Amino acid sequence: YHKMYYHKLNSTQSEDKLVYGGEKEPNRYVSGSVTEDQNYLQIYAGQNTSGRQLYIKDLITPNSKPVKIQGDYFARADVLYNKKRTFYLFTNIDAPNGRIVSVNLSKPNIWKDVVPESENVMFASSGGGYLFVRYLVDAKSQIMQYDLNGEIVREIDLPGIGSAYGFNAKEDEKDLYYS
């Protein structure tokens, strides 16, 4: 049984607190990370390589329980960015080519399209408070910058034909790098 624990530095292991996993969630591999603002824990739980569940735990509210955002083991929903309790997810749910949705923790079953699926395969990232989408168009990358409402800010001009990767940065950063 995979488990995720909270460990406070300079404390003993016996004081660790179980956050997720164990006998109630058998046969899952578990991973997690903290959001950039350090206020939320993203918990991913999977049983295969086709997808994984997503839970988000509020780290500010004492004794909060993880909120299930996505419960399908054969789909993906990855956190790109959060603005307080609103999370921007890249998902393949109802979108084989990918889409970006927003979800508020107070209403985790209500997903709103931010950047809908297109005819081209999509990959997504965030940086500087924006969303970046890399579309695969005619075997080359096309990069679009979106605001958090899904409005196109601009197309990123690339120096030539090829594949571009990267476009990740922290919220307050004004520069980002790609290859």
What are these regions (language model features)?
Residues Y1-S179:
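Peripheral, non-catalytic segments that deliver or gate enzyme domains
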